[in-house]
Amino acid sequence: MSKTIIIGNWKMNKTFTQTKEFFSAFNQLYIENKNKINQNLDFAVALPAINVAAFSKNTTKLELAVQNMSQFEKGAYTGEISAQMLLDLNVKYAIIGHSERRQYFKETDLDVNAKTQQAIKNNIIPVVCVGETLEEYEAQKTSQVIEYQLKNSLKDVDLSKVIVAYEPIWAIGTGKTATPEQAQQVCKFIRKQTNKNLTILYGGSVSQENIEQLLNQADINGALVGGASLKVDSFIKLLTLNK
């Protein structure tokens, strides 16, 4: 049986002090709810890079992820953080190509591919994000857009070492969400375009109310969660599937 994976994406939230407070509370609540969490579940939080050192306060099975990384190995790239630096801090996952990176920082599929290659080279698992805008969705171009992103973002990539996260852009932080059936349809398409054993996550207004239905879909292996991962109690509810 393949692992189920839940990754919380904190985006640009929480100070270093607030992050330490989160882990202190999480450690206790995890102990209280440990028996409700499926042993086949892997889970992580993607912190702002400046807060990664606070992860040392974690004493649970929780893994460490980041929200971005450099496409370059090392050198004169002011402000960048390399995969080697992240690996040295025990980072397991790197979110790559999130729609906010593509939208606000003009990241291209070429950039995403280069970062993905760097992550794999340094034994970090890349979580490559794909998804369509509201305009593309309404124009019924979802499959076309996803196919193009997959083709270019995953060019020459070993698919056994990558995770793909489908996040319909129109459902990120909007309170809207694709129905489990809609999400399944696109994730099934992603699997058809890639590899039958690929790990596929769904993201986009995932909450404790809808996560179980989403994870019951045949081609959804986990979730990439935004706002619901920022509070200890709601994150624990996600891990226990609201039990």
Swiss-Prot record:
Compartments reported by the entry: Cytoplasm
Gene Ontology BP terms: gluconeogenesis; glyceraldehyde-3-phosphate biosynthetic process; glycerol catabolic process; glycolytic process
Enzyme Commission number, as recorded: 5.3.1.1
Pathway assigned to this chain's UniProt record: Carbohydrate biosynthesis; gluconeogenesis; Carbohydrate degradation; glycolysis; D-glyceraldehyde 3-phosphate from glycerone phosphate: step 1/1
InterPro entries per the UniProt record, alphabetical: Aldolase_TIM, TIM_sf, TrioseP_Isoase_bac/euk, Triosephosphate_isomerase, Triosephosphate_isomerase_AS
Binding site residues for substrate: 9-11, 173, 205, 226-227
Active site per UniProt: 98, 167
Enzyme class: isomerase
Cited Pfam families: TIM (PF00121)
SUPFAM superfamilies assigned: Triosephosphate isomerase (TIM)
Assembly with partners or alone: Homodimer.
UniProt name for this protein: Triosephosphate isomerase
Species in which this protein is naturally found: Mesomycoplasma hyorhinis
